A protein has these predicted regions:
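Short alpha-helical segments that sit at the start of domains
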Residues: 1-12
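Hydrophobic residues on short alpha-helical segments
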Residues: 11-15, 72
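Short helix-capping/hinge SLiMs at alpha-helix to coil transitions
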Residues: 16-23
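Conserved, well-folded catalytic cores of nucleic-acid-processing
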Residues: 17, 33, 53, 74-82, ...
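Short, flexible active-site-proximal loops enriched in glycine and acidic residues
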Residues: 21, 58-62, 82-91
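N-terminal helix-turn-helix
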Residues: 24-79
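Intrinsically disordered, acidic Ser/Thr/Pro-rich low-complexity regulatory segments
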Residues: 83-337
């Protein structure tokens, strides 16, 4: 949709004023915003035209307007500059640096800690996933006896990460059992993509190991198919947002399903992706999810996202998200703080 520059400036101003005040924006407030460079009559005409285009809505009989979902989509696609971490004030940058310096670098602890800090910093909910690579697989298995009836299955990924799972064997497990089944796993499950784990392959491994050791085989299968883990922090901030809190139950339900949560916050490409709640399935009107990919080294990538109202302060929050994603990737890659 081609739109005159003046209409674009007015839409941009209404998005900013509505984000700050939470009330419909009238021509008088707009005139003050533009330092009286445009008359109230001119602004009323332009607002009426933007309403006809479907970019503004009039929520009640007052003269004020608010951005529609279509208006926010146009703003996000055409009017807001690509966020740059360099746009952050030095004080905000140093504060984020200090936050990461205090975090545990272990991925399973770093991801929720980063999401929690991002939520507290922005006043939105924040979500993140542990890093993953499209072609990640298991390169080596070890099976360690940790008790008479328990074995720890350790898997080293092709990116050098370690996954573990404990299996219980009701009939007991010897050291020889652990060594033999480790050999079996290394012959049958290393460098196998999750989608290639056929029922026939798993049945053959259980047959070779014996039924009593099948829990160890199942633990190894779970390690092969483990995907990125998603977490949600700061949900309490959504409960304070009148236009978002009705969606809180839906959001929590999505995050109870790790695969659905990971897909929800997955950005498109390397740029910041903003998804309006009305475009989601199920729809979450009044909500917006802004996500960014982070690079964790070795081909590993993850996602970090802000979840809040469609009237969030995009110009302030997107550079914060951009810098947070960069810092999270650096910390994951072990590049220091």
């Amino acid at each position: 949709m081609a739109m005159a520059a003046r209409k674009q400036r007015i839409l941009e101003a209404i998005v900013a004023l509505y984000a700050n005040g939470g009330e419909p924006v009238g021509s008088g407030l707009l005139a003050n915003y533009f330092d009286m460079a445009l008359s109230s009559a001119t602004l009323r005409n332009e607002m009426a035209a933007l309403t006809k285009l479907g970019l503004l809505e009039q929520p009640h009989t007052s003269a004020g307007r608010v951005p529609s979902a279509q208006g926010y989509r146009y703003y996000l696609d055409h009017l807001i500059d690509a966020p740059k971490a360099s746009a952050l004030p030095d004080a905000d940058r140093r504060h984020i640096d200090d936050l990461f310096a205090a975090m545990d670098a272990e991925p399973e602890k770093l991801v929720p800690a980063a999401a929690r800090s991002l939520a507290d910093l922005t006043g939105c909910a924040a979500a993140a996933t542990t890093p993953q690579a499209p072609d990640l697989c298991i390169a080596h298995f070890e099976v360690v006896q940790v008790g008479r009836y328990s074995a720890a299955v350790l898997a080293v990924t092709s990116a050098g990460g370690v996954r573990t799972r404990v299996a219980r064997v009701d009939t007991g497990l010897s050291r020889d059992d652990a060594a033999n089944i480790a050999q079996l796993l290394n012959r049958g499950l290393t460098f196998v993509a999750p989608q290639d784990l056929s029922p026939m392959l798993m049945a053959s491994l259980v047959l070779a190991a014996g039924e009593r050791l099948s829990p160890v085989i199942m633990a190894a299968q779970a390690l092969v198919t483990t995907g990125p883990q998603a977490c949600l922090e700061g949900a309490q901030y959504l409960a304070k947002m009148p236009d978002v809190r009705q969606n809180l139950g839906t959001l929590l339900e999505i995050f109870s399903d790790n695969e659905a949560a990971t897909e929800l916050i997955r950005p498109e490409g390397s740029r910041v992706t903003a998804t309006l709640g009305c475009d989601l399935d199920p729809a979450m009107p009044g909500c917006c999810i802004v996500s960014k990919r982070y690079l964790a080294g070795g081909g590993l990538t993850g996602s970090v996202a802000l979840i809040g109202s469609t009237r969030m302060e995009y110009e302030r929050l997107l550079p914060i998200l951009d810098y947070f994603a960069a810092k999270l990737g650096q910390s994951m890659a072990g590049q220091g703080q």
